[in-house]
């Protein structure tokens, strides 16, 4: 196998090209997307697996912050979902997660923060521009700006379908291939905006704030703040969102509506004999952004596809692994809503929902469930606190980092 075609230029297309061009310089990679390509991306809040994916492929934290306009993400703060606000920090082991949560609460950053299991916020449009330049180093990459309607139009053995919510290729060969999750997580839209970032919003974490008919994300990028009100489109949330922005002193930025086609493919792969097609990213699966799983599921899918291509797993195993990871995450996300205190049609839907709890997957260990279901806080030892004596307020740390200082 030496020929791979990546079709589509959303974030999943960019990451697929980056992965296969880097890992397999002996392969011929063809990247095909239309001249009028439009991406859905907003400010992305990622998880450590995405940061590790990028770093393994040569993109350093310094480049993410300095060149892509990114910022630190140590975890997520959940406000007003239940009667007590809580944090869901990153960290490989309990001790590290406890320390990261402590750092989040004080918003002071130690000098060795890059050695922790952390991630980043970044603007996907900036990532795309950065990668456009990065890709110039690849001798094995051919870019064709055109519209492709059939895999028969391209002379390749493997096709990676990165066509987003249109799901243009794999689903062409299956009837009713998309499995909806509206019975568990019915959010299917977001009102989004960008604004200048005030100092009180410059945090080293994403904030998710529960509202009457959904929740609002605050993603503090390096130079701007992105916000989005995630909801089901049967509810009109515009006025509530505008009132929130006014209360927070964020003005009246222009709002943009993003529709989300949630669910997953039942089959992510089709073998046509001389041609093989696999879906990655939004064309494969999407839930909703509350735990920043969009790019995680993309990089998870790319890595499992690599195993399929090189026959380390079978097609059935590939489908099973991807679907299991997705299905557990759906339950994990639904659990965020199940114990909300609000009494209206939106929140009451979740109270009666059957959710399989404490089921682990690659993304979320039992500790993550404890944070969400019990709002559990791990204790920090005095020895750990001593490590943070010289920690700096995040805004100062970020400015120093940009200047190459500690």
Indicate residue ranges for each PLM-predicted region:
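Conserved mid-domain beta->alpha element of the FAD-binding
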Residues: 267-330
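Glycine-rich FAD pyrophosphate-binding loop
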Residues: 21-42
């Amino acid at each position: 196998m030496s020929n791979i075609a990546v079709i589509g230029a959303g974030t999943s297309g960019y990451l697929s090209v980056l992965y296969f061009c880097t890992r397999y310089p002996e392969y011929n990679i063809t990247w095909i997307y239309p001249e009028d390509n439009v991406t859905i991306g907003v400010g992305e809040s990622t998880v450590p697996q995405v940061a590790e994916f990028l770093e393994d492929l040569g993109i350093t934290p310094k480049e993410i912050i300095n060149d892509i306009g990114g910022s630190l993400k140590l975890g997520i703060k959940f406000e007003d979902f239940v009667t007590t606000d809580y944090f869901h920090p990153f960290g490989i082991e309990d001790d590290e997660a406890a320390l990261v949560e402590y750092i989040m609460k004080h918003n002071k950053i130690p000098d060795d923060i890059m050695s922790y299991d952390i991630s980043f916020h970044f603007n996907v449009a900036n990532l795309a521009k950065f990668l456009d330049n990065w890709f110039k180093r690849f001798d094995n990459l051919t870019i064709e700006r055109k519209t492709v309607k059939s895999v028969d139009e391209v002379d390749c053995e493997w096709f990676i379908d990165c066509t987003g919510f249109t799901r243009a290729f794999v689903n062409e060969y299956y009837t009713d291939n998309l499995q909806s999750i509206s019975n568990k997580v019915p959010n299917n839209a977001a009102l989004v905006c960008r604004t200048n970032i005030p100092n009180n919003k410059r945090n080293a974490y994403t904030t998710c704030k529960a509202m009457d008919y959904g929740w609002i994300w605050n993603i503090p990028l390096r130079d701007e703040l992105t916000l989005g009100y995630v909801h089901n489109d049967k509810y009109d949330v515009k006025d509530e969102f505008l009132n929130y922005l006014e209360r927070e002193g964020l003005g009246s930025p222009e709002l943009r509506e993003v529709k989300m086609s949630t669910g997953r493919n039942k089959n992510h792969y089709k073998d046509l004999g001389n041609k093989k097609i696999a879906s990655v990213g939004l064309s494969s699966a999407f839930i909703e952004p509350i735990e920043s799983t969009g790019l995680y599921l993309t990089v998870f899918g790319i890595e499992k596809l690599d195993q399929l291509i090189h026959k380390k797993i079978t097609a059935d195993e590939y489908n099973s692994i991807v679907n299991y990871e997705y299905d557990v995450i759906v339950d994990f996300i639904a659990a965020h809503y199940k114990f909300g205190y609000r009494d209206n049609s939106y929140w009451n839907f979740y109270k009666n929902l059957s959710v399989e709890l404490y089921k682990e997957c690659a993304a979320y260990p039992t500790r993550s469930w404890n944070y969400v279901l019990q709002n559990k806080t791990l204790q920090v030892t005095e020895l750990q606190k001593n490590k943070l004596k010289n920690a700096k307020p995040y805004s100062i740390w970020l400015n120093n980092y940009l200047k190459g200082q500690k």
